[in-house]
């Protein structure tokens, strides 16, 4: 064989080997960055959730000083306050939620409840013989979507998805997803992202 041809074949294989090595390193680098960004986004989501829980807990503690008032002041567009004496509803801050079994659902003691299509983080506080439940809105989840009705997350928990159907909330005992904890350290729910590259995680 010709020396020039052997030399050019060696260069060809060297360049091909270097290109393959660079592709492998680049794909490993992208994979590690992708994993890191999902972990970071989950961490930020959880921190925002804890911040909102603290804000709600502070408002609930203020109810101790407003016990004599019939209608306590409740601030927050992304939360609902309901109060029960026994099983009788005595206070309802807004009409965002409604269910004939509302007392049963809330008194079961779960930290996460789904009422109709809405997921809520439940914070409980008793003032005298009235038990208040503050419900922090997490996600509105529809089994379908249209131009008028779309699943969406609470905007105070982070950026919203164009299609929140790609992010699934699961019970803590279900398989799949990453655990999200409340500020008391208890598992609240699992979140599983089926978000493609370029979409935004909540």
Regions found by a protein language model. Give the residues of each.
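N-terminal sensory and localization modules of signal-transduction and trafficking proteins
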Residues: 1-202
